[in-house]
Amino acid sequence: MVFSNNDEGLINKKLPKELLLRIFSFLDIVTLCRCAQISKAWNILALDGSNWQRIDLFNFQTDVEGRVVENISKRCGGFLRKLSLRGCIGVGDSSLKTFAQNCRNIEHLNLNGCTKITDSTCYSLSRFCSKLKHLDLTSCVSITNSSLKGISEGCRNLEYLNLSWCDQITKDGIEALVRGCRGLKALLLRGCTQLEDEALKHIQNYCHELVSLNLQSCSRITDEGVVQICRGCHRLQALCLSGCSNLTDASLTALGLNCPRLQILEAARCSHLTDAGFTLLARNCHELEKMDLEECILITDSTLIQLSIHCPKLQALSLSHCELITDDGILHLSNSTCGHERLRVLELDNCLLITDVALEHLENCRGLERLELYDCQQVTRAGIKRMRAQLPHVKVHAYFAPVTPPTAVAGSGQRLCRCCVIL
């Protein structure tokens, strides 16, 4: 919309400044910047710090340099509560020091992928940003234990911290962190490959409010560490153990006996887990909603039977590469409360014993939205077609190898690839 000078002047006369500011508060960054170009009056209103409490620069990441962050911090000052610099690789320590000095009321800061920053940034946040509650340092690979020591001393209100792929972090950094930040509710440590069981012992001792913990690819973790977490963090609702290949049923037993509120469990590639462990888990964790059991190669239909009986809230289940699962297990799942009412996503890639019979059973899952069937060699196009006639809204992803074409005759038309079919 384009305003003439008369239109803009009329709006300014009819509406008080306070109401215009309120209207501007609902606009995104781009629209605010456009409004700032209308007139001097609107420039002042649009760039008022109260309109810039939440800023996400992800869409402009390639253009954001340090001076942009510095200018924003000077403009917003104490108004700014939430800033996302995700992917802004041009932003470094110096700019974030200026930001921290100017925006001392910041509560939510996303620095995911800001690879230039070092411990110096965390020192600045510790010194000036005591109200910080949410901090994402994903892939800030220069971050060390010194950062965690600084954060623990100055950011004691922290509730969410993402340190994924900060692979210099060790148990000493975790100990320093949790001693100061005892109110942590979510701690994401994906790819922190130096962490061992002792780090989890420190978390157990101090983080009793913890609700979400991600240990994906922390390959040194064993049952001992998971048992300690379970004994100290009874409020745990989401736990990712994918890629922790040393774990056995002892970890599932500890979860079942200590964490009844568990809703999300990711245990992909934990190939030592068996039906016995999942049986105990299912019988005690009735709130489970999402489970990733990809490549839990020892589980059988017995696990599905227990989940069907005891986990009525299950919405998403990955069984990819669980090659012992059969149509009978899918029958129990489909006939259960979760199958009838809750199940939305089911992944059965490379479940070689699954046939079209399983698809007939899944017709009972009226809420099913997505079904993965890649490399299920006994599933046919006809079977999928019959199921989709009953569940037309479901998205089925499958792959069928192309039929070997006859030898081409010289001069024949162009051959077409018909193997990649998404149904």
Swiss-Prot record:
A lipid is attached at C420 (S-geranylgeranyl cysteine). GO terms for cellular component: cytoplasm; membrane; SCF ubiquitin ligase complex. Gene3D superfamilies: 1.20.1280.50, Ribonuclease Inhibitor. Residues 9-55 form the F-box domain. The modification Phosphothreonine is found at T404. It is a lipid-anchor. Changing V226M: In a colorectal cancer sample; somatic mutation. GO terms for molecular function: calmodulin binding; phosphatidylinositol 3-kinase regulatory subunit binding; protein phosphatase binding; ubiquitin-like ligase-substrate adaptor activity. It is found in: Membrane. Expressed in brain, heart, kidney, liver, lung, pancreas and placenta. Pfam families: F-box-like, LRR_6. Keywords: Calcium, Calmodulin-binding, Host-virus interaction, Isopeptide bond, Leucine-rich repeat, Lipoprotein, Membrane, Phosphoprotein, Prenylation, Repeat, Ubl conjugation, Ubl conjugation pathway. Changing C420S: Loss of geranylgeranylation and association to membranes. Loss of interaction with NS5A, PIK3R1 and PIK3R2. No effect on interaction with PTPN13. Phosphorylated by GSK-beta (GSK3B), promoting recognition by FBXO3, leading to its ubiquitination by the SCF(FBXO3) complex. Ubiquitinated at Lys-201 by the SCF(FBXO3) complex in response to lipopolysaccharide (LPS), leading to its degradation by the proteasome. GO terms for biological process: modulation by host of viral RNA genome replication; negative regulation of NLRP3 inflammasome complex assembly; protein modification process; protein monoubiquitination; protein ubiquitination; proteolysis; regulation of autophagy; regulation of inflammatory response. A motif (CAAX motif) lies at residues 420-423. PROSITE patterns: FBOX. It comes from the Eukaryota. InterPro entries: F-box_dom, F-box_LRR-repeat, Leu-rich_rpt, Leu-rich_rpt_Cys-con_subtyp, LRR_dom_sf. Deletion of the F-box domain creates a dominant-negative protein that inhibits replication of hepatitis C virus RNA when overexpressed in a hepatoma cell line; this inhibition could be overcome by NS5A coexpression. Calcium-activated substrate recognition component of the SCF (SKP1-cullin-F-box protein) E3 ubiquitin-protein ligase complex, SCF(FBXL2), which mediates the ubiquitination and subsequent proteasomal degradation of target proteins. Unlike many F-box proteins, FBXL2 does not seem to target phosphodegron within its substrates but rather calmodulin-binding motifs and is thereby antagonized by calmodulin. This is the case for the cyclins CCND2 and CCND3 which polyubiquitination and subsequent degradation are inhibited by calmodulin. Part of the SCF (SKP1-CUL1-F-box) E3 ubiquitin-protein ligase complex SCF(FBXL2) composed of CUL1, SKP1, RBX1 and FBXL2. Interacts with calmodulin; may antagonize substrate ubiquitination by SCF(FBXL2). May interact with PIK3R1. Interacts with PTPN13. PANTHER family: F-BOX_LRR-REPEAT PROTEIN 2, MITOCHONDRIAL ATP SYNTHASE COUPLING FACTOR B. This is F-box/LRR-repeat protein 2. It comes from Homo sapiens. The gene is FBXL2.
